[in-house]
UniProtKB/Swiss-Prot annotation:
Component of the ubiquinol-cytochrome c reductase complex (complex III or cytochrome b-c1 complex) that is part of the mitochondrial respiratory chain. The b-c1 complex mediates electron transfer from ubiquinol to cytochrome c. Contributes to the generation of a proton gradient across the mitochondrial membrane that is then used for ATP synthesis. CDD domains: cytochrome_b_C, Cytochrome_b_N. It is a multi-pass membrane protein. Binds 2 heme b groups non-covalently. The lineage of its organism: Eukaryota, Metazoa, Chordata, Craniata, Vertebrata. Its main location: mitochondrion. Its cofactor is heme b. A ubiquinone binds at residue 193. One of its GO terms (cellular component) is respiratory chain complex III. This is Cytochrome b. It comes from Micruroides euryxanthus. The keyword Chaperone does not apply. The chain crosses the membrane at residues 25-45, 69-90, 105-125, 170-190, 218-238, 280-300, 312-332, 339-358. Heme 1 (or BL or b562) is low-potential and absorbs at about 562 nm, and heme 2 (or BH or b566) is high-potential and absorbs at about 566 nm.
């Protein structure tokens, strides 16, 4: 029976023989999701969604619950690992032209938006200083929506300010959204295996495919082992590496932190938001920074799918990576002279990539045709 099952996996899932390690991040994301749901479930057992008890319940989990510190740290560090994997996954998609499989790319972008919402709700739950103020600042952006803004914000808060109903509904949303992520991931995987994955060359893989098991399965397991090893190393040697010191203080609506900022994985979008000195403009730029990814399948102009053979576009791609990193860095800094200009310049450069990429593809086609 076991041999029959193995044969089924081998025969039903042929995969291109030349896909590199960059194609392993899908399975790493699946591992992260399982890890987050498992640890999240055990944390939810001991967590109390009440503004007076939430902070104390997190301390109780860390100090008193057997292995609670492992659950709490794995969940917090696991979220950062999740975003490292997803950003690498997206970067690989942009570099190798995976976005040309439109249905897979658009379902993946939807997944990213749901994941960011889930992570934001989760960041509010410990009810520390930064949790409270990040929630206040980000949810306040909804008031920029013409006509409906104030109504939508009041509805989300469950009152006229962030209070107990807000925390309760954020906990409910943080609990339910991962199950929507599982459903969306299933759709994402079904759509992917409908046509099959692309490869580093950007050519059709049909002529040279090998069974997923054992070749790619062992490759996946190697990467999963490395990721879990990294997780355990961070958890044991630097458990607060990704934490904000402000969040070790209980939320106080009367004291504003000197510098309000979300978790590191939102800093690029937050940096773009801050660079525009207008509330509605900043909010639009924030949403556009993620939604703009959906335009890439429709603006691809090059005859070549992958950037592996397009040196000019490679320069543009690595400029985007440098820009992303710089925006993230400036968002950690206070809003003052050098950082304001740097974030404005890098924000323009970030959006310029999505305009320059099709233009450069068109120019490369012209160069190739004239050779």
């Amino acid at each position: 029976m076991l041999n029959q099952h193995t044969l089924l996996i081998s025969n039903l899932l042929p995969v291109g023989s030349n896909i590199s390690t960059w194609w392993n991040f899908g399975s790493l994301l699946l591992t992260c999701l399982m890890l987050q749901i498992l640890t999240g479930f055990f944390l939810a057992i001991h967590y109390t969604a009440n503004i007076n008890l939430a902070f104390s319940s997190v301390i109780h989990i860390t100090r008193d619950v057997p292995y609670g510190w492992i659950m709490q740290n794995t969940h917090a560090i696991g979220a950062s690992l999740f975003f490292i994997c997803i950003y690498t996954h997206i970067a690989r998609g942009l570099y190798y032209g995976s976005y040309l499989n439109k249905s897979v790319w658009l379902s993946g972008t939807t997944l990213l938006i749901i994941l960011m919402a889930t992570a934001f709700f989760g960041y509010v739950l410990p009810w520390g200083q930064m949790s409270f103020w990040a929630a206040t600042v980000i949810t306040n952006l909804l008031t920029a929506i013409p006509y409906l803004g104030t109504t939508v914000t009041t509805w989300l808060w469950g009152g006229f300010s962030i209070n107990d109903p807000t925390l309760t509904r954020f906990f409910a949303l943080h609990f339910i959204l991962p199950f929507i992520i599982i459903s969306m991931s299933s759709i994402h995987i079904i759509l992917l295996h409908n046509e099959g994955s692309n490869n580093p060359l950007g050519t059709n893989s049909d002529i040279d495919k090998i069974p997923f098991h054992p070749y790619h399965l062992y490759k996946d397991m190697t990467m999963v082992s490395i990721m879990i090893m990294l997780l355990l190393m961070v958890m044991t040697f630097a458990p607060n590496l990704f934490n904000d010191p402000e969040n070790f203080s209980k939320a106080n609506p009367l004291v504003t932190p000197q510098h309000i900022k979300p978790e590191w994985y939102f800093l690029f979008a937050y940096g773009i938001l801050r660079s525009i000195p207008n509330k509605l403009g900043g909010t639009l730029a924030l949403f556009l920074s993620i939604i703009i990814l959906t335009t890439t399948p429709f603006t691809h102009t090059s005859y070549i799918q992958s950037m592996a053979f397009r040196p000019l576009t490679q320069i543009l791609f690595w400029t985007l990576i440098a820009t992303f990193t710089t925006i993230t860095w400036t968002a950690t800094k206070p809003v003052e002279t050098p950082f304001i200009y740097i974030s404005q310049m890098t924000s323009i450069m970030y959006f310029s990539f999505f305009i320059m990429n099709p233009l450069l593809g068109w120019a490369e086609n012209k160069i190739m045709m004239n050779m």
